């Protein structure tokens, strides 16, 4: 059986491994960088397989976080009351198990209980991540804009899902 639980600091080394195995769909991170993201995040959730092992995670931030990501800054300038998903990553072994759906349903519920009016995120267009774009479309994410980041080496689709 699969489940979700709050991430803890002791999980972060495993989170780095899962994250970096997802490259180039997600940027590589060090333990220090993931710890900083963890500390900035108001939503920190792990997805577990039937053995209780972390096979995926999500980190998301409230408005007003002291975060200098080009994408977060873009949304901060356009949305007053959003929950920004910095990353959602799964190990290959977790794909197709419904964990992404479970995690996003939980995240959207969290955003609603926080009184947020939208969930925001970005998905890579270059390098392409078509699976993630399809996944986000299923949750009602709509195009806001595109943006070149990291000196033009990455192009992202900026997305938002309005919350009713």
What are these regions (language model features)?
Residues 86-95, 125:
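A short, internal acetyl-CoA/4′-phosphopantetheine-binding micro-motif in the GNAT/acyltransferase core
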Residues 77, 146-164:
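C-terminal "cap" of GNAT-fold acetyltransferases
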Residues 2-15:
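A short beta-loop-alpha structural element at the N-terminal edge
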Residues 59-87, 151:
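Conserved acyl-donor/pantetheine-binding loop and adjacent beta-alpha core of acyl/acetyltransferases
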Residues 24-51, 59, 65:
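Active-site rim helix/loop that mediates acceptor-substrate recognition in acyltransferases
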Residues 111-125:
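Conserved GNAT acetyl-CoA-binding A-motif
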Residues 90, 96-109, 138:
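Conserved acetyl-CoA-binding loop-helix of GNAT-fold acetyltransferases
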Residues 101, 125-145:
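Conserved active-site alpha-helix within GNAT-family acetyltransferase domains
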């Amino acid at each position: 059986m699969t489940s979700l639980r709050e991430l803890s600091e002791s999980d972060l080394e495993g989170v780095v491994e899962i994250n970096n195995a997802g490259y180039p769909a997600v940027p590589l991170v060090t333990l220090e960088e993931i710890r900083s993201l963890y500390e900035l995040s108001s939503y920190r959730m792990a997805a577990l397989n039937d053995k209780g092992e972390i096979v995926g995670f999500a980190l998301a931030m409230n408005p007003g976080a002291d975060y200098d990501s080009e994408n977060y800054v873009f949304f901060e300038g356009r949305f007053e009351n959003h929950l920004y998903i910095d990353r959602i990553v799964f190990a290959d072994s977790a794909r197709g198990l419904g964990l992404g759906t479970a995690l996003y349903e939980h995240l959207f519920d969290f955003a609603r209980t926080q009184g947020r009016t939208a969930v925001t995120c970005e998905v890579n267009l270059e390098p392409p991540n078509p699976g993630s774009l399809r996944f986000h479309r299923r949750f009602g994410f709509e195009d806001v804009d595109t943006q070149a980041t990291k000196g033009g080496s990455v192009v992202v689709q900026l997305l938002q899902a309005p919350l009713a």
